[in-house]
Amino acid sequence: MKSGSGGGSPTSLWGLLFLSAALSLWPTSGEICGPGIDIRNDYQQLKRLENCTVIEGYLHILLISKAEDYRSYRFPKLTVITEYLLLFRVAGLESLGDLFPNLTVIRGWKLFYNYALVIFEMTNLKDIGLYNLRNITRGAIRIEKNADLCYLSTVDWSLILDAVSNNYIVGNKPPKECGDLCPGTMEEKPMCEKTTINNEYNYRCWTTNRCQKMCPSTCGKRACTENNECCHPECLGSCSAPDNDTACVACRHYYYAGVCVPACPPNTYRFEGWRCVDRDFCANILSAESSDSEGFVIHDGECMQECPSGFIRNGSQSMYCIPCEGPCPKVCEEEKKTKTIDSVTSAQMLQGCTIFKGNLLINIRRGNNIASELENFMGLIEVVTGYVKIRHSHALVSLSFLKNLRLILGEEQLEGNYSFYVLDNQNLQQLWDWDHRNLTIKAGKMYFAFNPKLCVSEIYRMEEVTGTKGRQSKGDINTRNNGERASCESDVLHFTSTTTSKNRIIITWHRYRPPDYRDLISFTVYYKEAPFKNVTEYDGQDACGSNSWNMVDVDLPPNKDVEPGILLHGLKPWTQYAVYVKAVTLTMVENDHIRGAKSEILYIRTNASVPSIPLDVLSASNSSSQLIVKWNPPSLPNGNLSYYIVRWQRQPQDGYLYRHNYCSKDKIPIRKYADGTIDIEEVTENPKTEVCGGEKGPCCACPKTEAEKQAEKEEAEYRKVFENFLHNSIFVPRPERKRRDVMQVANTTMSSRSRNTTAADTYNITDPEELETEYPFFESRVDNKERTVISNLRPFTLYRIDIHSCNHEAEKLGCSASNFVFARTMPAEGADDIPGPVTWEPRPENSIFLKWPEPENPNGLILMYEIKYGSQVEDQRECVSRQEYRKYGGAKLNRLNPGNYTARIQATSLSGNGSWTDPVFFYVQAKTGYENFIHLIIALPVAVLLIVGGLVIMLYVFHRKRNNSRLGNGVLYASVNPEYFSAADVYVPDEWEVAREKITMSRELGQGSFGMVYEGVAKGVVKDEPETRVAIKTVNEAASMRERIEFLNEASVMKEFNCHHVVRLLGVVSQGQPTLVIMELMTRGDLKSYLRSLRPEMENNPVLAPPSLSKMIQMAGEIADGMAYLNANKFVHRDLAARNCMVAEDFTVKIGDFGMTRDIYETDYYRKGGKGLLPVRWMSPESLKDGVFTTYSDVWSFGVVLWEIATLAEQPYQGLSNEQVLRFVMEGGLLDKPDNCPDMLFELMRMCWQYNPKMRPSFLEIISSIKEEMEPGFREVSFYYSEENKLPEPEELDLEPENMESVPLDPSASSSSLPLPDRHSGHKAENGPGPGVLVLRASFDERQPYAHMNGGRKNERALPLPQSSTC
């Protein structure tokens, strides 16, 4: 039927449409395919997509039960689907990324039950992988019941859809079991960008090697190219060139002649919601249909199938619409010419129709108060071109629901020239109200029979009104069976044969011969389900028209010698039916009773069939080698249920578990076994244990609220409706198959992959390196119960368990399809223990090689091993990955000092850690005396030369200093301890020297570490600048010679820095007094003061708003860039804080000049044990605990600086004393999230505060994660984007704490023994500078305070700790 609201164009029509479109409209080598592509049962049908660029319609891929290798199928041309994408039960498909690598847009022009992307029951799908999918224009996504599907939590759907609230992602693999890893995260070099989902700021990717594409924020809602260049505003999804409306992958609005346009040009029309076509294109669609079809129309600038509501065609051959005068006439047509109305649903198809082309057959057998519904849907019909037949409509009392019917043309008539036929309507009492009704029957006769409640006078009145009086013969309006509820059947019909199958019954009966054979009209067969043989003819009938019997009319055989019969189909297998037959005759006997015939009630059962699948399969593990499985019987046993077949198969481990190196904490994937309680004899609920009402201890589960119950109920109903809709949409009927086909399908999985073996065999299967091993199925038979226990399984291993139902005909028909469940066994205690002894072999250069056997049956899979070894002092740990162990069979320990050692080894599997092995003892020998003698011969001359050279240099420098008349205000310096000074302590003027007359001081800026800091002007210190505003640092007049030399040495540190984000040294005035250091002027002071000035309550607030998120990120990037430069030049800052960052005139933040601001904020430091001042509130746990300072500890301090920025320079750990802060941080405490702090900024802080230093990002990685948020000028001036930023060799980045000298904070620690960290001797170094001062040297005196804080690398330097004159 084609009506105003429904019906689609034939496939041939669309074929012509898409062929012409492919040749003329789309500017690629591909085609526009459609109107919808349905690929089912055979994976080779995928070839239909080979040349498709756009699918104008939907794409179904479903019901492919045989697992295939899809890697050879790739469709890179496909970029757009205009409607929706549906995937359902496709075996073997693991990712969509290879199939559709360039699918970019799903428009959702028409949806599948409100969804544009549906992925349902895809058992092998491991990831979606549509890494180029950028836009789903309309509709939501539904991803459900995909047992192995991961990488769902790593996709930010808000970047693809406008709204994510209607998305439904349920029943997939739990994220904790997936171990989703975005590209580069395992190597700690993440490549993907981060976004926030449900308050979780994380990397976004589609697979382990494909990031989710995000466009720069500067693009707004525009798409972008692969190189992050913004597309033209009319582009959707992506483009091949920036700002080019001819280079779009898809169009935001409409596509025409190779260009994306906001609206269709003149003389073109919108089509299918995405492109523009001309009038001839619409006309070509018309010509493709049959001649009597009205085809497409053009209305309101759109080419569409029919006029919208309120409009009608302007003539039968017109392509244009005009407004209706009053209700619009609407012509409806049934393709089969006859429309059967047997329910409200079928009547609904006629809603709004005024003219019906064809015949109406009304057959409403049951239903209460159905007339109002029929009137809503059929009340506007005015004309029927064919005939109207009303039969067996026991629910009808009147025909008034056809309230506007005024003309029956009778162009097509029933046999006998009938155009109005009313037969066997048990409750029909009235036709129409003829006082207010004009109905014309233009051609044909009327026929009325077997309407016991319809008065003959009502029929005669209709004759007069309709103009048919005189057309009917005497038998057409039978006065004996209309209006008379009497009937008596005197003859008995006898069945002659019955034949049954699983859903059919064929019956025949004796031919009935009434006295006048002409009065035999037909037969009616009545049948119904009858579990018991106690039904009667009148069961289920009432005055309202309810009737429990199904009725089928059987026409008389044309050959009088053939016995009448009927095929009843659509029956249920293995079901007993009651059947009887009644003859419909007009024969009258003398007492005016109707003469007829009927049979006795016959009981007959259909044949058995394959049962439906078992229901509600559950599995739980009660030990490391057993799984308990429980299920419910099938809803349709289709026979006498006899037994069940239980089959199980070990599942291979996920491939990434073999590929990744898990020697990093917090990155080991989590697996859970199938917990729960299933009792073998009786299934009982395991009561939950929760904390209710604030009281601890086990108690009942807290009751759900009414709102929660209602929400769960609605969700369950919605899920059921969706599944029904899904199954009704994709399961289409096909011709009945032969029985051998049914048997073959039912037994395919049961026989082809089974083998005759016992369950015990599964325990001895080895664990090969083959990632996707196909393990065999094992099976057992379960009789007379719905539960079983599977034994002899491997510990902590995932199994697939299939349950098949089998009835008494299983040998012949086969068993049901399977219902399956995945379950994991419990871990076995001791399974991860290393079974044999640990052995060792000596290796050259103070190394040994440890060997040990692998656990035989581990809990799932061994991921790594951990070695704990050491001598008498402290144990060290070494991690050995699975790959390394498989390659070498053990591990090598290098660079061991001579002595006795013990070592123990522990394995880590998917379930956790095993036990430590018994210790193995080994001895590392010292080098032989001969070797020592050789070394001594080599080293002695070198030492003598160094000593002599040092003495010569000292004498030269001393002589030069002595003759320098301008030293120390013209007075010679007499040292109390002349042996203390070395050549390294004396400052030698160099190219940084500036003449004093070029410096002019103007005003004081503040007090520095050594003296006052002034603002001034320097001439010629910056190239191409005659005069430059500078900061001038001085030394107090009362400063000692040591302090003056230290002042100049600290300035010398700055000579090596040349970075935009580090405050620059411009020159030094060391000749004469006072000594001056010329620095870059930072007019806005230190960052701490600047941030506090932005507080609203500050009186000196320069009317500047608090920094926005983008400004905070800009500050963070500038600080990180300066720190990355220091790190690249082997400097460890050790005192990174807001007070030590400076703010320039243009608000650029730079790393400070390492001394200018420290005395101002001396309260930010803490003196531990009476020694040097320490910035404990900015220090990392390892720095507080072991005195280790590395670039990782600088990253921790950087996180605290971010916290200062977010709080406008509040004091960290406010409310805690310095001692409390020290303990709090060493015990793992962290700063709380500041109020109104953006998630992105706080997530960056948390990354910097990882307790394990190795887990913290480097400064370069920090910049990489926020580089898209930085201002464009950052690229021009930063170290990150400079040529100087070259990645060093891996050896150079090895700043591991274990490779560094770890000495307690006590500066008086003896060189002979290392005291515990909390012991303090209270002694000071006898010679040298005051506590807390660190002079940069080539090597450090062990007794020099805080020398150990420089880190443990010879080529790495540390910046000085803060000074204090009070030390």
UniProtKB/Swiss-Prot annotation:
This is Insulin-like growth factor 1 receptor. It comes from Homo sapiens (Human). Autophosphorylated on tyrosine residues in response to ligand binding. Autophosphorylation occurs in trans, i.e. one subunit of the dimeric receptor phosphorylates tyrosine residues on the other subunit. Autophosphorylation occurs in a sequential manner; Tyr-1165 is predominantly phosphorylated first, followed by phosphorylation of Tyr-1161 and Tyr-1166. While every single phosphorylation increases kinase activity, all three tyrosine residues in the kinase activation loop (Tyr-1165, Tyr-1161 and Tyr-1166) have to be phosphorylated for optimal activity. Residues 960-1367 are cytoplasmic. A motif (IRS1- and SHC1-binding) lies at residues 977-980. The active site is at D1135 (proton acceptor). The keyword Protein biosynthesis does not apply. The lineage of its organism: Eukaryota, Metazoa, Chordata, Craniata, Vertebrata. Gene3D superfamilies: Hormone Receptor, Insulin-like Growth Factor Receptor 1, Chain A, domain 2, Immunoglobulins, Phosphorylase Kinase, domain 1, Receptor L-domain, Transferase(Phosphotransferase) domain 1. Pfam families: Furin-like (PF00757), PK_Tyr_Ser-Thr (PF07714), Recep_L_domain (PF01030). One of its GO terms (biological process) is cellular response to amyloid-beta. Residues 1290-1299 have a biased composition (Acidic residues). Disulfide bonds join C33-C52, C150-C178, C182-C205, C192-C211, C215-C224, C219-C230, C231-C239, C235-C248, C251-C260, C264-C276, C282-C303, C307-C321, C324-C328, C332-C353, C455-C488. The chain crosses the membrane at residues 936-959. There is a cross-link at K1168, K1171 (Glycyl lysine isopeptide (Lys-Gly) (interchain with G-Cter in ubiquitin)).
